[in-house]
Structure formats: structure tokens, C-alpha cells
Amino acid sequence: MTNIKNTFGNKFIGAHVSAAGGVDQAPLRAREIGANAFALFTKNQRQWVAKPLEEKTISAFKANCKMLGFGAEHILPHDSYLINLGAPEEEKLNKSRAAFIDEMERCNQLGLTLLNFHPGSHLKKVSEQECLATIAESINLAHKAVPNVIAVIENTAGQGTNLGWKFEHLAEIIDQVENKERVGVCLDTCHTFTAGYDLRTKEDCEHTFAEFDRVVGMHYLRAMHLNDSKVEFASKVDRHHSLGKGEIGWSCFEYIAKDPRFDGIPLILETIDPDIWQQEINTLRKFHIEEIANS
């Protein structure tokens, strides 16, 4: 357990693994691919309601995480895709807020401290500003209902009426969240790239992350999704690809693996071929260990 940091350096790299058969299986699957971080769904992501977690499942999950050395700060649960915390219709908004609070409660029961979610969509029925304010209020309500868990906003590709693709959207939400200690950001490299922030070269990465720091603040970065993109720059389309096989290329992922600003947070693959996740993790880790050796 104690040797994980020594073996893997300061980077916590994994993938979004299946929780089929119970959430307690997720840490086992993560370890099979050589991960020291992972993401999961704590319930079926395409259903509104799930039966409560059983005590034996909660205990088994915690025991497996402890046995394999996974800390809560390196586990990134993702909420249901159905939830829209900026929904313009009251009924959908109330349903989304109740479901989000349930997701946060499940994280708390499992001893987890992060909950990753897509911010929301205005559906062309309200202004961007109104939608962003509604999202922030949804986070505030969840914070009041459930302790400990940090709401981690994922930037989006900008498809349709989804908000969160501009760094300014993220900053505007955070600005209206009352408890700043319990809000953060997960940057998805594919989404960032297709939203119009270039990542193809080291210089592009320097510029994009400097812009994120200026607008949002690097101290809010709690996690990353490492994905290449099947579609071209600034296309506003979300299509993930395996690392180095898409439009972004390896330079970006080498940059992240070598930059200490991305130490200590979950770096999660959502790439399209689970058969090569271990290979992708090993390549990222090799870049990181090289940097440590040369520093």
C-alpha cells in the first residue's frame, strides 16, 4: 500500500471502469489495468432511480479500496447522464436536483469525496446566464443536503445547448457557489480541444492552461479526463479517441504527464479501446517517471 507513490511517482492515472456486479468490483478492475486512480458510476447512468447501496456492498468497496491503496481523492464517480442541473422546466429541474443529491449521498456513503458531472443545458428556453445561475444554485442545494463531497464540474465540448464549454462558464458557476471549498473542475482534453482551446503542441498546452488559470484558477482543478479526439479542432463535437490516434496527438498527454501541476489528481482515461488502457496508462507513467529522473 505505502509503495504506490514510490512506484508510480506523483501521477494518479486510471480509467472509467465498469461497476457491473456491484461498485465493490470497480477497484479490482482498476488494479487489473495497473491503475492507481479510477472513475465509476455508483448506479446505472441511464436511469433516474436506483435501489440504495447495501451495507455489505459499501463495506466491500471500502475494503477493496483500502487493500489496493486507492485513496478517495483519486476516485472520480460520475453522475447520471439524465441529470440537467440547469434545466429550464421546474419538473425536470426538481427531478435532476433530487437525483444529484442522491448521487452525492451515494458518494458520501462510499467514503468518496468527489462527484463529477456535466453542468447542464439551457435547451434554448432561458439565457446562458440564467442557466449558469440555476446550475450554481443546484450545487448549493446539494451542498446543504450532503456533507463532505466536492462537486466537480466537467467542461463540455459545446454540443447542442450544453454549457460549460467556455472557461468563463465554469468561472461563472463557481463564482455563485457559496462553499468554494466544495467545488472544482474536471478538464476533459477532448472536450477542451473541440470547444476551441488548442492542445496539439507544448506551446498550445502552455497557452490553454494559462488561460484556464487566468479565467478559473488552477487551484480549482480536481481531476482530468485524458481523451484524444476523433473530430477536428473547435468542431463542438464530442467523440473520444485512443491517446495519440486522434486529432490532439501524444504531445498533449506527454505534457500533462510531465507537468507537476497535474500531480495528485485523478487522470482518467475514457478512451475508446479498453483493451489498450493498460498500455496507455504505462506510456503516461513512463513519461512521468522520465521527468522525475531528469529533474
Swiss-Prot record:
It catalyses: Endonucleolytic cleavage to 5'-phosphooligonucleotide end-products. The keyword Metal-binding applies. PROSITE patterns: AP_NUCLEASE_F2_1, AP_NUCLEASE_F2_2, AP_NUCLEASE_F2_3, AP_NUCLEASE_F2_4. The keyword Glycosyltransferase does not apply. Zn(2+) 3 binds at residues 191, 238, 240. Endonuclease IV plays a role in DNA repair. It cleaves phosphodiester bonds at apurinic or apyrimidinic (AP) sites, generating a 3'-hydroxyl group and a 5'-terminal sugar phosphate. Belongs to the AP endonuclease 2 family. This is Probable endonuclease 4. The lineage of its organism: Bacteria, Pseudomonadati, Pseudomonadota, Gammaproteobacteria, Vibrionales.
